[in-house]
């Protein structure tokens, strides 16, 4: 009970169809950033729209430069482009569309799927935010598979992010395992 009140779970209006992949851990934010274009390209090749969630405007701009270098068309939704928000969100669910967004695409942002996208698996969300709050992770992931549509999401963490610096023994173990091989570690959810 919160504030002395009972809590009631409100069921979904339609069954949830989101597929959540196991989280991936990367040695550094740099290694993670280098891996994003290949993942995005693979999803776009399937005809799926992709939303990549990042923490800051600077990260959005850096990722935009990486995607440009890889020849991947995309839109950026951040505080610098807030006047275009409605147009970017309206296009974000179209087949093969890539959107890079800061937390502006969080709670309350409903990305509608374009023609044929549901049959291809729906919107895929790649959450590359290292949030101290699980609520913010859920908001990012929650952009996929809304209103009974199919969709998928995955969370990619960078072990050099500030949230991991005070994590104790479990983070220390992950760091030691990460040193055994470069790049990403897949860990069970």
Regions found by a protein language model. Give the residues of each.
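Conserved phosphate/anionic-ligand binding catalytic regions in large, soluble enzymes, centered on
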Residues: 1, 93-112, 135-157
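Interdomain helical connector at the RecA1-RecA2 junction of SF1/SF2 helicase-like NTPases
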Residues: 1-27
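Generic beta-strand/beta-sheet core signal
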Residues: 10, 53-55, 70, 77, ...
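Conserved nucleotide-binding/hydrolysis micro-motifs of P-loop NTPases
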Residues: 13-17, 56-59, 81-83, 104-108, ...
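Conserved interdomain hinge at the start of the Helicase C-terminal
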Residues: 20-51
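Flexible beta-alpha connector loops of hexameric P-loop NTPases
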Residues: 20-32, 74-83, 126
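Conserved motor-coupling elements within RecA-like helicase/translocase cores
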Residues: 45-46, 57-122
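C-terminal helicase module of SF1/SF2 nucleic-acid helicases/translocases
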Residues: 117-189
């Amino acid at each position: 009970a919160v504030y002395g009140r009972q809590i009631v779970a409100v069921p979904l209006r339609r069954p949830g169809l989101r597929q959540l992949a196991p989280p991936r851990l990367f040695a550094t934010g740099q290694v993670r950033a280098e891996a994003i274009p290949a993942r995005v390209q693979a999803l776009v090749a399937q005809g799926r729209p992709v939303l990549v969630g990042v923490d800051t405007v600077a990260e959005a701009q850096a990722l935009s430069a990486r995607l440009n270098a890889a020849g991947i068309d995309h839109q950026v939704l951040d505080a610098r482009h807030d006047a275009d928000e409605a147009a970017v969100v309206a296009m974000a669910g179209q087949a093969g569309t890539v959107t890079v967004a800061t937390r502006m695409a969080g709670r309350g942002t409903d990305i509608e799927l374009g023609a044929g996208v549901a049959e291809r698996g729906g919107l895929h969300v790649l959450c590359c935010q290292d949030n101290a709050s699980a609520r913010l992770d859920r908001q990012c992931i929650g952009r996929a598979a809304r209103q009974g549509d199919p969709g998928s999401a995955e969370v990619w963490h960078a072990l050099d992010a500030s949230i991991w610096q005070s994590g104790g023994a479990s983070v220390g173990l992950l760091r030691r395992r990460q040193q055994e091989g470069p790049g990403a570690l897949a860990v069970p959810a």
